[in-house]
Amino acid sequence: MNKKYLQHINPGIDSIRPYEAGKSIEDVMKEYNLKKIVKLASNENSLGPSPKVIEVINNFKNIHLYPDGDGKNLKSKISEVENVSPEQIILGNGSNEVLEIISQTFLSAQSESVFSKHAFVVYKLASKVRGSKFHEVDAKSWGHDLDKFLEHINEKTRLIFIANPNNPTGTYLPHDDIVNFLKAISNEIIVVIDLAYFEYVKTDDYIRTNEILNEFSNVVITKSFSKIHGLSALRIGYGIGNADLIEIMNRVRQPFNVNAIAQKAAIASLNDVDYLNASVESNSIEREYLYDCLDDMSLKYIPSQGNFICIETPFNGKKIFEELLKKGVIVRPIELYEMPNHIRVTIGKRFENEFFIEKLKETLKSFK
């Protein structure tokens, strides 16, 4: 069969392989004939969404109608929570889409992007799709080395991606470090600060987003409803930035990109502050529990400010992952992030964490 059309694909796509999501519970049950599965692979909120979200979804009507293409009600709620104007907000089909929109808007084959090793893989994918050259900067203590970033910035740099906290390592950057970095670069460069896990951070020196946005017009903050809000299946996130910048990005955004159920669910979740606080507290308690267990096992891990822990194993992480699958535990191997001996584990409920530790002990013992 003649496939000459393949020679006309856009430059950069040749080197991309499709993103491999974590295995589903259904797939593992079927493949290994298991009845009990604990999924700790994708950094979802193990408590699920707020009951108020479930109520909104169950009562949803008018599914035959298109959603509000501008998301006015949701933007109004976000503007209240974030203390910004609705004109400073762009909605996305997950914050992932917002990252794609930013890349579409500012990257080309003639421009460059900068991001860290061991950072969210979408930064690299979004750059490659645009045919843009990218600089993957060596990490410092598993996190962003902003001084090294400066060494890779030139007149072609258009985008810089900073995840805070970083996924998959869980490291974070203090507010002052980010401010000093922003002051050191040209305001012609767009800096994307990805805060998908910001709600879980418990440090006094964490980024103060309003101060950043008020001082720097070249910054876009992205946030997600997939993590602490528990709305992963609905795909919804948003970006905040200077109104002029957001207006340009909205020219690229597809019509009706965020569905109506997701918009209503997001509003309900933002309204249930008590539930979000309870999710944060549960995560903190269970994170300490897992730290204690890993310490008892003499396993190294990267202290995390997210709802996940990056664990260094004495063996190949992919093999550990495969053995855990057979025992009914789904975690995330991260050799794609150049961390071949690490696995990333979502912090779950107590019974899930206990099951994981039990099966991890069995797996490590079987490797000796």
Sequence positions of predicted segments:
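N-terminal "arm"/small-domain region of PLP-dependent enzymes with the aminotransferase-like
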Residues: 1-65
